[in-house]
Amino acid sequence: MFDVLVYLYENYWRPDACPDHDQLSKKLSAVGFESEEIADALTWLDGLAGAAESHIGTQSELSLRVYSPSEQDHLGLASIAFISFLESAGVLPPAMREIAVDRAMALGGGPVALEDLKIIVLMVFWSLGEEPDALILDELFVDAEDRLIH
């Protein structure tokens, strides 16, 4: 599913630039994605669109987020720490944080891998038509193992 999401981010400027689900499914199949992976991604994107509509403007900039035990278990410490990092850097406002948490919680399975959370955050920016600044975009795309330490 995450490969499909990255493909959409790289090939469509905004969600409204994407064709309808049927045409998009055909295009994604033609590129080589599996039908189950495509269906999962499109369902997840529908949830993203709904979450974006329901969370915009509902949080104060001064609010403090307390994660429930189920959120802590599902997100994992690395993902929660990364969300906190983005918030403290001033690039992930509370409404976008809530959308990211909502979409991460929509995933099945155990703790969300940090790489997957980064794609989720990237897709939240994408869904709202916002481009993260270059440093944050680098943080979202580059693996820590690939970084060159000076």
Curated annotation (Swiss-Prot):
Pfam families: DUF494 (PF04361). Disulfide bonds: none annotated. PANTHER family: PROTEIN SMG (PTHR38692:SF1). Belongs to the Smg family. This is Protein Smg homolog. It comes from Leptothrix cholodnii (strain ATCC 51168 / LMG 8142 / SP-6). The gene is smg.
